[in-house]
UniProtKB/Swiss-Prot annotation:
Subcellular location per the Swiss-Prot or TrEMBL entry: Cytoplasm
Keyword presence, Repressor: no
Lineage: Bacteria, Pseudomonadati, Chlamydiota, Chlamydiia, Chlamydiales
The protein's role, per its UniProt record: Catalyzes the condensation of (S)-aspartate-beta-semialdehyde [(S)-ASA] and pyruvate to 4-hydroxy-tetrahydrodipicolinate (HTPA).
GO molecular function annotation: 4-hydroxy-tetrahydrodipicolinate synthase activity
Active site (record annotation): 129 (proton donor/acceptor), 157 (schiff-base intermediate with substrate)
Family matches, as SMART domains: DHDPS
UniProt GO cellular component terms: cytosol
Species per Swiss-Prot/TrEMBL record: Chlamydia pneumoniae (Chlamydophila pneumoniae)
Keywords: Amino-acid biosynthesis, Cytoplasm, Diaminopimelate biosynthesis, Lyase, Lysine biosynthesis, Schiff base
Protein name: 4-hydroxy-tetrahydrodipicolinate synthase
Length: 291
């Protein structure tokens, strides 16, 4: 079982990137052995300028992490997405997370042609991202079937919220690595053969998340994990997890970029979420503590 952390992008109150907090987050994930995904929806990738994204990725690569590092490629303008892929091709990353184009709602042929274009441009393997709640369309099963043997098609991150659809992806492309993209569904998707979890909660609890990923049917882990999810996921991601990280002093500020706002999260949820994870069974080895 593998764990990748969908990493937040820390900001100062003036909106600039807090690179010191980012380094702290990445170093902790590296110490535990969790891979990282940068500039996805949790990383507010669509809210960063091209120069900011370039600076962030180069900064992360300069840290020489020992764990896999994946980079998000969200966008709707193909020329810009291809330009971003070409920039990242020359960097020592592990691969891309390629999101179904948002807002435009492509049908089957358009989606296949889009992913063909971005996969053909990539020199690193890619995980395609099924996220219909944000993209307004799913990663179609026939798209997966058409691209199943593309040499750069490594896997799928499934945040569709359906175990049945997850199983359909697996039956169509059994050789593709399937990642659960929702913290709340890890136990069910692990039982269906998931390769791993791409987690948001692991930003704040990297060791606990790793234990749960390795032991998805352990009832004590599952109960505490689900209780924490109940408090964190009361609003749009990454608002809740940034509030948690700031509370735990993992990042300096819970700053987000508009249209996201910390005002859309009840800060009274922070303490119960943190307290619920304090009941986690004592880890065999502890690498660090945020607070």
């Amino acid at each position: 079982m593998h764990l990748l952390t969908a990493t937040v992008t820390p900001f100062f109150p003036n909106g600039t990137i807090d690179f010191a907090s980012l380094e702290r987050l990445l170093s902790f994930q590296d110490a535990v052995g969790n891979g990282v995904v940068l500039l996805g929806s949790t990383g507010e990738g669509l809210s960063l300028t091209k120069k900011e994204k370039q600076a962030l990725i180069c900064f992360a690569c300069d840290l020489q992490l020992k764990v896999p590092l994946f980079v998000g490629t969200s966008g709707t303008l193909l020329e810009e997405v291809l330009d971003w892929i070409h920039f990242c091709n020359d960097l020592p990353i592990s691969g891309f997370l390629m999101t179904t184009p948002i807002y435009t709602k492509p049908k089957l042929c358009g989606q296949i042609l889009w992913f063909e274009a971005v996969l053909n441009a990539a020199k690193h393997p890619a995980i395609l991202y099924n996220i219909p709640s944000r993209a307004a369309t799913p990663l179609y099963l026939d798209t997966v079937k058409a691209l199943a043997h593309h040499p750069q098609f490594l896997g799928i991150k499934d945040s569709g919220g359906s175990v049945e659809e997850f199983q359909s992806y697996k039956s169509i492309a059994p050789h593709i690595q399937l990642y659960c993209g929702d913290d709340v569904f890890w136990s069910e998707m692990a039982a269906c053969g998931a390769h791993g979890l791409i987690s948001v909660l692991s930003n704040a609890w990297p060791e606990e998340a790793r234990e749960y990923v390795l032991n998805p049917q352990e009832q004590d882990y599952r109960s505490l994990w689900m209780e924490t999810c109940r408090w964190v996921y009361t609003t749009t991601n990454p608002i809740g997890i940034k509030a948690i990280l700031a509370y735990k002093k993992a990042i300096t500020h819970a700053q987000l970029r508009l249209p996201l706002s910390i005002e859309d999260f009840d800060l009274e949820n922070v303490s119960p979420a943190v307290e619920s994870m304090l009941a986690w069974p004592k880890l065999r080895t502890s690498v660090f503590s945020y607070s």
